[in-house]
A protein has these predicted regions:
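N-terminal glycine-rich phosphate-binding loop and ensuing alpha1 helix
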Residues: 2-49
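Short phosphate-binding loop-to-helix
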Residues: 47, 53-112
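Conserved alpha/beta core of the MobA/IspD/sugar-nucleotide pyrophosphorylase nucleotidyltransferase superfamily
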Residues: 166-251
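Hydrophobic/aromatic residues located in beta-strands of well-ordered beta-sheets
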Residues: 5, 46-48, 92, 123, ...
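Conserved core of the sugar-phosphate nucleotidyltransferase
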Residues: 102-190, 196
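Short, high-confidence coil segments that cap the C-terminus of an alpha-helix
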Residues: 43, 89, 118-120, 215
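A conserved hydrophobic position in a structured secondary element of the catalytic/binding core
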Residues: 50-51, 102, 179, 230
Length: 251
């Protein structure tokens, strides 16, 4: 099985323009993400997928495989789909370009189920919410699955709502995905024909396009507490963590 890791990277972010190139201890953020991916032995190849020449040039300067893609994509999954049309593989793993501290074992968790079950089409990760504030935070997608870990719904609301009991462990989405080529083809063709699916559009959660259309998304629980860089303040947190790890000799 040929497995490719793909890191979508946009320069034009509404909250933090240019963040893939933000400096972290002398290297652009995208370099840190890429190097975490290289530690995943199951990944045969890793690419950054971008529509920006500045990111392309930074990748080339830092020895990073890069694929130029259209600037018309509405989602990162659409960008992965274009890569799939250009580079053949049996499995594509979507790794977010704004999580430079993402652990290799977390990435592996999205891959391993495919090696044990060849009927799987899509995997996604989830982690238990430890901070109660995140349960009511609309920026945090909550995951609801059945007993087999198949996704039933994802929402930015508090769900399930604790009307009768608060004895429930809430989970949030970790944005690492595994896609078979056929699943990516469906996602892209649906988008070209219909645009975003109804619930996907309302919640603004990409994976709902699959769930709304009957695809089974296998969720895997991980113990992940990585820091996503959405703002300059997040970047400062990551810089501090990296600096501390370098001093401790753990990087």
């Amino acid at each position: 099985m040929k497995i490719i890791g793909v890191i979508p990277a946009r320069y034009k972010s509404s909250r933090f323009p240019g963040k893939p190139l933000a400096d972290i201890c002398g290297k652009p953020m995208i370099w840190w993400v890429y190097n975490q991916c290289l530690k995943v032995k199951e990944l045969d190849e890793v690419y950054v997928a971008t529509d920006d020449v500045k990111i392309e040039e930074a990748c080339k300067q830092n020895g990073i495989n890069v694929v130029m893609t259209s600037d018309q994509h509405k989602t990162g999954t659409d960008r992965i789909g274009e890569v799939a049309r250009k580079i053949e593989a049996d499995l594509y793993v979507n790794i977010q370009g704004d999580e430079p501290l993402l652990e290799p074992e977390t990435i592996r968790a999205a891959i391993l189920p495919f090696l044990e079950n060849d009927t799987l089409q899509i995997t996604n990760l989830m982690t238990k919410i430890k901070d109660p504030v995140e349960v009511v935070n609309f920026t945090v997608p909550k995951v609801i699955t059945n007993k087999e870990g198949i996704g039933i719904y994802l929402t930015r609301s508090t769900a399930p709502y604790p009307k009768g009991s608060i004895d429930y462990a809430y989970y949030k989405q970790v944005c690492v995905y595994g896609f078979k080529p056929e699943a990516l083809q469906f996602y892209c063709e649906y988008g070209q024909t219909y645009g975003k699916a109804k619930i996907e559009s309302i919640e603004d959660i990409e994976i709902l396009r699959f769930i709304e259309n009957g695809y089974k998304v296998q969720y895997i629980e991980v113990d992940s507490d990585t820091v996503a860089v959405d703002t300059p303040n997040d970047l400062e947190k990551v810089r501090k963590i990296v600096e501390d790890r370098k001093k401790a000799g753990t990087i």
